[in-house]
């Protein structure tokens, strides 16, 4: 998208940053409302509509010739993707057993990361042929999940139809303190891990140069992808409500160890890769863990609403590049990783605070 906005509309790096940040923020905010409404309707149909909106956004971008419309369409794409992701989690929670949920979510996260790994280089190759090819390919690829969901996904009972469902009331979200702490924890965790590649590249450009930054990113991204693809399912399947506290604590330790490793990696690419591997283990523990925490507190019939509220935590990843830039220009470069260490410790503390809260959703929704 960065290349497209630069080539088609001649936007500079600063304007592209504002445009993409605006689109991401708009997408997240609107996805919250649409995600909450998903509990009132059949989740299968909701996922199909989200995919259709996703595809329409990609089809429309090459057809319009106005940068504002492009940004709005990109916001639509992000909103549709976020809604689909949220409703998919809710469908897992509604239709799978407790022992199966984390395994399937970990498998989903693994496949998702394969897509994130393959997508950028493939998109770059397509851009070399035609600036619009990545958008057409994205629209075509979205047809596959459309067919898969239509054929193999069973209809999910809406909140109002479920026998054991709680009374659907969005105000419950505002009164659930556990949800508040878990969402704040997710915000800080995504601030630390959600945009770590761009964060590292910013850091290296300050302490070295853009050439070495490219080498570092070329090392840490494949390491991150390999660790996630190879270990995510194995780690996620072992996560249960009984052991979640010590395992999430272990994940926090891996995050901290990886960040300390980044501080002392210097110009050694091997140490950058090793630190990225340690850091990524924290990521693959936190991803299914945060899902399980929300699933455990969400009342029946309000799973999508709770996952939508938690998705606000991804704003942390959106804030990271801006915050990293401010830190790197006002403080010593190593301070960036110290701030990230403090953030993940606070994320862990807020998570524990949420775990200690006695479940109150039954009393609220009865």
Question: What residue spans do the PLM features occupy?
Answer:
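Short amphipathic helix-loop junctions that connect adjacent transmembrane helices
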Residues: 1-14, 198-217
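Cytoplasmic helix-loop-helix junction between adjacent transmembrane helices
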Residues: 75-112
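A late C-terminal transmembrane helix in Major Facilitator Superfamily
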Residues: 301-330
